[in-house]
């Protein structure tokens, strides 16, 4: 049932128009074609806009539809007239038949009564033995039955004749006086071929039946909606209800009409829209959009959002908001444009103005104004046909002019320059210029400094219509106040408490480390993410427990597999392993905390109950299922209570924010933990695991890292800058790699630049990027891009003396100010990098030191050589470069003693590679000494030693593995005997050693 009370005023207007059209056509029913015409007559109806959006001319379509319906109505009138005449004739004939049938039925009634009388008399005669009377009565009865059969045959003949015209059940009802003549004729009309034909055309059958019935019976039908239109309106009601709308809008009626493909209105609209293919899409939403005014379609009412409390509070920015108000109150040039870096709060200023307008905290001239935020992307999206974008924008501006109290806010206002400007079209800026010049519209814009310069300033006609308001980044104190104002919103959203120290951390840490973004945006993001992470940590299961649960699940699958294979021994082992993991999980749950443990346990119980409920339902045990559901409900209630208790305890701290900032930048900014403190104190020992000797170098590097991690480094300079001098192969590059591995867990995290690649003056472009107009400008520089991606890193400038002097000039500001500007004008932050430069300058003086001398002589000679090296360094590098380096470290040449230690490190690396095969090698002292002797060269350092091990250990070992002499799992001892290296399995070597010692003991005894 449809209720007109549910329809909006505009919907009722269209329905009234449809009724008017039906009356003009002398129709007694309002059908879908009348509704279609009513919607098409209004150029602003959702249906008219919808078809025009698809490139269909509304007026042309309306004309074609009207002509088609006019011709159809003429044909229908003729068909109705003919059908009515046929039915009138049929009615006359039926009336005659009915009269004859009446006579026959009267005769039959008389015969029936006579038969009843004879049967009574016959029974009486037989009872009293009057056989003569009985025979006479029987003869009379037979004559009556013969007459009755004859009359019934006549009736059957009439029934057969009527059945050729009417339905048999209708004829039967008619003959039994259950159906009148008019009823029979109406039944015939409903089942006539004419009605079937109009159904195919999509015309509601009751509309034609009413017209024919009026002519046949002379009774005027009631004026109402047709069956088909009633169905369409019911569908529209359903759509409105499903969308939660209080009233049925024209968009719902239009969508229901388009979807009613069996009606004449639906058929006509679907034919022009492209039929089934087009209608696969849901058009309701699109029609709903077409129903809105241009402002509602392409804009958001900020005043309305402010009334609903959906805008964040705006703290501070008094100067900028007042400046915007002043410009809006001007007589001319009253269009402010907010210019500032991304993230400084330009949009927030406009939202603050909207809140002031709603709260009546503005001058009277602005109190009735509405601020609408316009989405340029929505204006452009879907404008497939030429002129469609201009039409949308023009309609929007016309509505703004008509309303008179609208201020448009266009975020990223530079997008209006060139927007929609296809071949032969005018862009949005040029469409808006005349209205801006005449003061017909007021616009607030927002854009960045670069884009203002690039787009707005390039167009003087557009620029002079706007008055810029420059928005600076707020100070740390102002940002703290902003975050305190936002705190209630964030706490309510995340269900956590945010401490003052977390707010302070968000501002200070992002200010210092997130240099590529602006306050307050970056501070808000850091605090928001920290709150989200805090909530997730408590609600989610800890990663360690998740990992154990994964292992338990995998073991369960293996247990089932072992059971199926009949491997019961393996099954038992797996069960023991599973029990250990379960115990470990329980211990971890206990460590996590009582509440977390209870929450995890409850969740597990609920999961188990779900399985049991499912099993009970499958078995049909409804009583057990109900019991389990009650138990589950209790557990869920308890779980909810525990989670609420836990959320009350959640407080976002400094460390939470620091963790987020560390993740963003890769810089460790969280407070030092006990474990990390111990690691930093033992940094020298860790570095010495890879670098032999060079105590002074290792100590200098470790101290620089400790200063940075303790927060004592100069915040305007890199963590440390070193120049490593010394001959090749003494550990300069190795120390850099070891440092990178300690800091990042991987020596590949080192940003390494071989300075021999930068011999030419123009190779500076490789480091900071090619200048504009040159090939590779878009790619950026090797150094600047690497540091932008990893601001916390170790930069190794290998063989620095081989670079062009002009390339070294580039590093002056890096070493002093910790910053470098790339070819795109972006400032890259080097304040969290360790810069290590290596060089071989003056290494000839170091090689002259007698390495076999005693330690005192060695140290004295080293100091003399060191002075000469530093003197020579001054000849290669300018004083301003040397002066900016934190520490110049001269590496000592390696002695035989150090090389022996290096062999141990190199063999350890070989064992790491062999670990996959479970093979291990050990060197005897004789083998070690011989390798040092063969691999020692003071001029080349430790590198020849690596080649010696490769030649005398790795190559023979590989041959023996391939031949099968050394198998997986073996430990091999490498010894030096009789001028060659021998490889002996450890068991055999131990046996030989024992035999030798035994024989030597015997000799002693003898």
Swiss-Prot record:
GO MF, one example: ATP binding
GO CC terms in record: cytoplasm
Superkingdom, natural source: Bacteria
Binding annotation for ATP 2: 726-733
Entry-linked SUPFAM superfamilies: Double Clp-N motif, P-loop containing nucleoside triphosphate hydrolases
PROSITE patterns associated with the record: CLP_R, CLPAB_1, CLPAB_2, UVR
All copies of domain Clp R, residue ranges: 3-289
Residues of the UVR domain: 603-638
A Gene Ontology biological process term: cellular response to heat
Residue ranges of the region described as Linker: 474-666
Location in the cell: Cytoplasm
UniProt cross-references to Pfam families, sorted A to Z: AAA, AAA_2, AAA_lid_9, Clp_N, ClpB_D2-small
NBD2: region residues: 676-893
Region named C-terminal: 894-1006
Classification via Gene3D superfamilies: 1.10.8.60, Clp, N-terminal domain (1.10.1780.10), P-loop containing nucleotide triphosphate hydrolases (3.40.50.300)
Family: Belongs to the ClpA/ClpB family.
Recorded domain comment: The Clp repeat (R) domain probably functions as a substrate-discriminating domain, recruiting aggregated proteins to the ClpB hexamer and/or stabilizing bound proteins. The NBD2 domain is responsible for oligomerization, whereas the NBD1 domain stabilizes the hexamer probably in an ATP-dependent manner. The movement of the coiled-coil domain is essential for ClpB ability to rescue proteins from an aggregated state, probably by pulling apart large aggregated proteins, which are bound between the coiled-coils motifs of adjacent ClpB subunits in the functional hexamer.
UniProt function note: Part of a stress-induced multi-chaperone system, it is involved in the recovery of the cell from heat-induced damage, in cooperation with DnaK, DnaJ and GrpE. Acts before DnaK, in the processing of protein aggregates. Protein binding stimulates the ATPase activity; ATP hydrolysis unfolds the denatured protein aggregates, which probably helps expose new hydrophobic binding sites on the surface of ClpB-bound aggregates, contributing to the solubilization and refolding of denatured protein aggregates by DnaK.
Name of this chain's protein: Chaperone protein ClpB
Gene: clpB
């Amino acid at each position: 049932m449809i209720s007109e009370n549910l329809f909006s005023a505009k919907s009722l207007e269209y329905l009234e128009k449809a009724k008017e059209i039906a009356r003009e056509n002398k129709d007694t029913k309002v059908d879908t074609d009348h509704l279609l015409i009513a919607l098409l007559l209004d150029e602003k109806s959702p249906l008219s806009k919808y078809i025009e959006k698809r490139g269909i001319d509304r007026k042309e379509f309306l004309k074609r539809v009207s002509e088609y319906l006019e011709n159809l109505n003429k044909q229908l009138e003729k068909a109705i007239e003919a059908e009515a005449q046929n039915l009138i004739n049929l009615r006359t004939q039926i009336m005659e038949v009915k009269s004859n049938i009446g006579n026959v039925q009267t005769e039959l009634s008389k015969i029936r009564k006579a038969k009843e009388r004879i049967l009574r008399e016959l029974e009486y005669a037989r009872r009293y033995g009057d056989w003569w009377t009985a025979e006479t009565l029987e003869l009379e009865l037979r004559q009556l039955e013969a007459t009755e059969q004859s009359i019934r045959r006549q009736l059957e003949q009439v029934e057969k004749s009527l059945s050729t015209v009417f339905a048999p059940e209708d004829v039967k009802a008619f003959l039994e006086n259950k159906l009148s003549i008019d009823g029979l004729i109406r039944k015939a009309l409903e089942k006539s071929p004419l009605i079937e034909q109009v159904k195919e055309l999509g015309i509601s059958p009751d509309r034609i039946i009413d017209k024919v019935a009026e002519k046949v019976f002379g009774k005027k039908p009631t004026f109402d909606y047709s069956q088909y239109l009633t169905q369409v309106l019911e569908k529209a009601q359903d759509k409105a209800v499903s969308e939660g709308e209080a009233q049925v809008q024209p968009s719902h009626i239009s969508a229901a009409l388009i979807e009613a493909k069996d009606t004449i209105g639906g058929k006509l609209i679907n034919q022009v829209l492209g039929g089934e293919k087009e209608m696969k899409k849901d058009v309701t939403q699109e029609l709903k959009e077409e129903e809105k005014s241009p402002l509602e379609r392409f804009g958001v009412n900020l005043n309305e959002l402010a009334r609903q409390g959906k805008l964040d509070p705006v703290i501070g920015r008094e100067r900028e908001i007042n400046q915007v108000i002043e410009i809006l109150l001007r007589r001319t040039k009253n269009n402010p444009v907010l210019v500032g870096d991304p993230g400084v709060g330009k949009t927030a200023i406009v939202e603050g103005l909207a809140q002031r307008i709603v709260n009546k905290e503005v001058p009277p001239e602005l109190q009735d104004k509405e601020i609408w935020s316009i989405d340029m992307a929505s204006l452009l999206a879907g404008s497939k046909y030429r002129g469609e974008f201009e039409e949308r924008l023009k309609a929007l501006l016309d509505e703004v002019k008509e309303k008179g109290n609208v201020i448009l806010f266009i975020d990223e206002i530079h997008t209006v320059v060139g927007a929609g400007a296809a071949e032969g079209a005018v862009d949005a800026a040029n469409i808006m210029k005349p209205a801006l010049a005449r003061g017909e519209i007021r616009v607030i814009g927002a854009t960045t400094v670069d884009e203002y310069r690039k787009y707005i300033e390039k167009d003087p006609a557009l620029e002079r219509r706007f008055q810029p308001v420059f928005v600076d980044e707020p100070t740390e104190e102002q940002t703290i106040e902003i975050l305190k104002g936002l705190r209630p919103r964030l706490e309510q959203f995340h269900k956590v408490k945010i401490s003052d120290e977390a707010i302070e951390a968000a501002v200070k840490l992002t200010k210092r480390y997130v240099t590529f973004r602006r306050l307050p945006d970056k501070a808000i993001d850091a605090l928001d993410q920290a709150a989200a992470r805090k909530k997730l940590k408590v609600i989610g299961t800890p990663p360690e427990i998740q990992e154990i649960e994964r292992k338990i699940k995998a073991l369960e699958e293996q247990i089932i597999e072992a059971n199926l294979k009949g491997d019961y021994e393996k099954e038992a082992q797996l069960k023991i392993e599973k029990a250990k993991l379960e115990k470990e999980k329980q211990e971890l749950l206990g460590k996590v905390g009582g509440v977390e443990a209870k929450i995890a346990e409850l969740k597990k119980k609920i999961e188990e109950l779900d399985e049991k409920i499912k099993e009970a339902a499958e078995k049909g045990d409804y009583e057990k299922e109900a019991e389990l559901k009650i138990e589950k409900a209790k557990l869920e209630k308890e779980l909810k209570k525990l989670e609420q208790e836990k959320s009350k305890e959640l407080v976002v701290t400094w460390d939470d924010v620091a963790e987020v900032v560390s993740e963003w930048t890769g810089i460790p900014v969280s407070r030092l933990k006990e474990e990390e403190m111990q690691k930093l104190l033992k940094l020298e020992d860790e570095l010495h695991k890879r670098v032999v000797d060079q105590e002074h170098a290792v100590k200098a590097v470790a101290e620089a890292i400790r200063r940075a991690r303790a927060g004592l480094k100069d915040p305007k300079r890199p963590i440390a800058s070193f120049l490593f001098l010394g001959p090749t192969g003494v550990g300069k590059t190795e120390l850099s790699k070891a440092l990178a591995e300690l800091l990042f867990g991987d020596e590949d995290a080192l940003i390494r630049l071989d300075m021999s690649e930068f011999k030419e003056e123009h190779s500076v472009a490789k480091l900071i990027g090619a200048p504009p107009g040159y090939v590779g400008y878009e790619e950026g520089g090797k150094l600047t891009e690497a540091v932008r991606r990893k601001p916390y890193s170790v930069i190794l400038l290998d063989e620095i003396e081989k670079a062009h002097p002009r390339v070294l000039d580039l590093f002056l500001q890096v070493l002093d100010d910790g910053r470098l500007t790339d070819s795109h004008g972006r400032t890259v932050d080097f304040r969290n990098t360790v810069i290590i430069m290596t060089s071989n300058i003056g290494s000839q003086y170091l090689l002259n030191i007698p390495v076999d001398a005693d330690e005192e002589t060695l140290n004295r000679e080293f100091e003399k050589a060191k002075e000469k090296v530093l003197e020579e360094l001054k000849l290669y590098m300018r004083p301003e470069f040397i002066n900016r380096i934190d520490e110049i470290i001269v590496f000592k040449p390696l002695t035989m003693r150090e090389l022996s230690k290096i062999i141990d490190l190199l063999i350890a690396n070989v064992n790491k590679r062999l670990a996959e095969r479970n093979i291990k090698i050990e060197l005897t002292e004789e083998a070690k000494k011989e390798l040092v002797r063969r691999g020692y060269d003071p001029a080349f350092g430790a590198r020849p030693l690596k080649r010696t091990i490769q030649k005398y250990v790795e190559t023979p070992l590989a041959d023996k593995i391939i031949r099968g002499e050394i198998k997986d799992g073996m430990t091999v001892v490498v010894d030096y005997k009789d001028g060659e290296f021998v490889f002996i399995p450890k068991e055999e070597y131990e046996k030989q050693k024992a035999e030798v010692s035994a024989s030597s003991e015997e000799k002693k005894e003898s």
